[in-house]
Each structure stands twice: as structure tokens, then as C-alpha cells.
Amino acid sequence: MRPKERTIRTGPRTGVRVDSMLSAALIAEFITPSDHLWLVSPWITDIQVLDNGHGAYDALFGDVPPQGCRLSDALARISHGGARVHVVTRGDAHNGDFLRRLVKAAPPNRIHIEQDPNIHEKTLCGIDWILSGSMNFTVRGMAKNDESVTYKAGGASAAQARLDLAQRWGDGE
């Protein structure tokens, strides 16, 4: 596959949001989970990442599809599909609800959480794609703040990022 790259600038002035880009990446992970999926962000809220209010994603969820899917649910579903999910965030109470929900919903041997007080990077990275930029995975980051987010599929960027992330924080095994 030829590498593809798209940078978007989100915020109230642009009227652009990152929702569809993030949803597409997570749906791809539902279908074919990466061996390792990395989420790195100092601030994480259990944001809704898929709106299934009109049933567009019913086939992904089985017999009782939810109206929506939160980030912790999406990552847990991906971990149940075989991915080892790595989360690097700050050890701040703000991130607590998200982390508790993720740990409760995912198989324990498929989740690796690192808390780093100095983390400032914002990245979501699978086997052959990476989403990175200035956006925290929070309501403000996704819907209110002016942000710059780049999505790259194919090429060497994701592989290099996964190597760098594993070197910095290990793989939790």
C-alpha cells in the first residue's frame, strides 16, 4: 500500500472535527486488530468515539448493538480481538474514570498502563497507521480546542513510532 497522509486542523473556526478519522481507525482495529495498539496522551476522557444512534455500526457489535461506543469500550473490544493495548498517560485523577473502565472491560493480560508525569505526546498507533498531533483524547481536544492532527497509513511512520514507544515504556510483559 502506498503511504497516505492527511493533516486536519480542527476547532470552532474551521468547523472540522476529528471524529470520523478516529472512528475509521478504530473500526479498522475492530475488524483486524493490531498486535500492539498504543494510546499516548497526558489527558484522557472516556469520550464517545462511535455514534451508533442510527445503527450504522450494528454489524460490528453483534446481537445487542449499543447506541454509542466510548473510548474505553473500543479499546477493550480491540483487546478482546487479540491486540495488546498500551496506554501511557499521566497519573492524574482526571484520567481515572477512563482507566478504571478500560481495566474492568478488557482482559487483564491484554492491557498495559504506564503513568508518566512528564508525558506530553499525543499519539494513537496501530500496526500500519498512526494518528498524532496536538489533540488530547478528551472532549475539549476532540470537539472544542483548535488542534492539528495528522493521520498516516502505510509507510514506516507507525513502525518507527511503535519501536520508539516500546523502547520508552516497554511492552508490559
Regions found by a protein language model. Give the residues of each.
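PLD/PLD-like phosphodiesterase catalytic module centered on the HKD motif
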Residues: 1-173
